[in-house]
Amino acid sequence: MGMGSNGELKYEISQNAYIKLVLHSLRHKTAAVNGVLVGRISPKDDGVVEISDSVPLFHSNLALLPPLEISLIMIEEHYVAQGLSIVGYFHANERFDDVELCGVAKNIGDHISRYFPQAPILLLNNKKLEALSKGKERSPVMQLCVKDASKNWRVVGADGGSKLLLKEPSANVVLSDYISSEKWKDVTDVDDHLDDVTKDWLNPGLFN
């Protein structure tokens, strides 16, 4: 199957990319946060977008375009040597019970999809994240949103679990351990880096 409409695609996210985004949202629990998904289209031509890494972006002023554009260029330049690029967007809303895509998320998703038309938005679902701590959640704690034929963002419904796949089945178990050990305190985002350039947005030591 070639790369048809977004509805046919599957998105496979690696454990580290997935965990980093969730930890970032936990570090800034009372704020909206965002990040980008880094990866490539699977060379097997099997309709899979492989998300191999992620970069936590901001925890304040998410709607400001200049810092966003600077960040996207910086991220693209870093990953191009590895044959990877920005393939999607992650968003966590400020309110715990808010699972709607806000205007800011849609706008940034639109911006990224100009360069990578198959780009999804992954939206954090806090209720699923809460269920994780009780050992009840095996599927990703994120909702998959894609563009429909009329270019509007929509949440992929009940079958979303089959479209967004965790590359490593143990990802939620590992995430749960990291949450218990308060690993989220170690996450650095681009926001932190712009304030203090010694802080590394690549988070090289996070999973050591």
From Swiss-Prot:
Superkingdom, taxonomy of origin: Eukaryota
Ranges where the MPN domain occurs: 11-146
One CC-aspect GO term: endoplasmic reticulum
Pfam families: UPF0172 (PF03665)
Family: Belongs to the EMC8/EMC9 family.
Protein name: ER membrane protein complex subunit 8/9 homolog
Organism: Arabidopsis thaliana (Mouse-ear cress)
